[in-house]
UniProtKB/Swiss-Prot annotation:
Top-rank taxon: Viruses
One Gene Ontology cellular component: host cell plasmodesma
Gene name tied to this protein: MP
GO biological process: transport of virus in host, cell to cell
InterPro entries with a match to the protein in the record: TMV_movement, Viral_movement
Key words of the record: Host cell junction, Host cytoplasm, Host cytoskeleton, RNA-binding, Transport, Viral movement protein
Pfam families in the cross-refs: MP
GO molecular function: RNA binding
Name of the molecule in the record: Movement protein
Family: Belongs to the tobamovirus movement protein family.
Organism: Odontoglossum ringspot virus (isolate Korean Cy)
Length: 303
């Protein structure tokens, strides 16, 4: 029905690199952003140069402007614009703060639903990172989403995040903007996953027993099947896979043990597997063997 325009914040606010200038954010979001609500940096990470820590920078990047023309819209959004990423590294979307303001008179009916989407995920419930619902009578609103997960730099450069909006009950002519939204993301850029992968603290290790950790980082469906059983099942399935038959090994034919024994005993009838012809040319023997004859695979059995 109406046109929905997203007016997004254009600002960059470096946290870790103190030598760079800091730019002031819009007043709408200035009091809403608290880095400590999303991430906790240690004293070493705050004071040491980025070259000596896993965390390279913590930034609030500038965001693109998005314009929507219909009630239901799904638009790409660049939450990392202006952020210097690390090649072959990672970026963590620690949080997202959204502030909206209705461009309507007081006591208007209707409302809006806003959702942050990861378009890589095929299942809708897994692609939804967070959502918010509000009515048009609430002139200004602010909410935050904490995705708190990392993606590779290569994936981040493809623009994997989207914003879905759904406006209902707002009676406005086409070509006008009923709602303005500002997006500010908090992201952490780092070179490797080791730091974030060592969150667990080992409490107890016994010989032949499981390792006891303080944090459950494995999904429930994985915990139901021990990894040793998974490995055994995986190997057994691979061994049962049929291999391609080969009639020749190093240019020589292979006879099965039964036919070979009959041949050595002077029996001219070698069963159903009969050598029809031998043609020698350029050192290669062309021997035709029936399908019932055993064959050998010259490929390695290792995997």
């Amino acid at each position: 029905m109406g046109r929905l325009r997203f007016v997004v914040l254009l600002s960059i606010f470096p946290i870790k690199t103190f030598s760079e200038p800091c730019y002031t954010m819009a007043l709408v979001l200035r009091d809403s952003i608290k880095i400590s609500e999303f991430i906790n940096l240690s004293a070493f990470e705050k004071l040491l140069p980025s070259a000596l820590t896993a965390v390279k920078s913590v930034r609030i990047p500038k965001v693109d402007k998005i314009i929507s023309y219909e009630n239901d819209t799904l638009s790409d959004i660049d939450l990392l614009k202006g952020v210097k990423l690390v090649e072959n590294g990672y970026v963590c979307l620690a949080g997202l703060v959204v502030t909206g303001e209705w461009n309507l008179p007081d006591n208007c009916k209707g409302g809006v639903s806003i959702c942050l989407v990861d378009k890589r995920m095929k299942r809708a419930n897994e692609a939804t990172l967070g959502s918010y619902h509000t009515s048009a009578c609430k002139k200004r609103f602010t909410f935050k989403i904490i995705p708190n997960y990392s993606v590779t730099t290569a994936d981040a450069l493809k623009g994997i995040w989207q914003v879905m909006t759904n406006i209902r009950g707002v009676e406005m002519e086409k070509g006008f903007c009923p709602l303005s939204l500002e997006f500010v993301s908090i992201c952490v850029v780092y070179l490797n996953n080791i730091k974030l992968g060592l969150r667990e603290k080992i409490l107890n290790v016994t010989e032949g027993g499981p390792t006891e950790l303080t944090e459950a980082v494995v999904d429930r469906f994985v915990e139901k099947v021990p990894m040793a059983a998974r490995l055994k099942s995986f190997r057994s399935v691979n061994k049962k896979k049929p291999s391609n038959s080969s009639k020749f090994v190093n240019g020589k034919s292979r006879l099965n043990s039964r036919n070979k024994l009959n041949y050595e005993n002077g029996d001219s009838d070698v069963g159903t597997s009969v050598v029809d012809d031998i043609v020698v040319g350029n050192g290669v023997s062309d021997i035709r063997i029936d399908d019932d004859c055993e064959s050998f695979d010259a490929q390695s059995e290792s995997y």
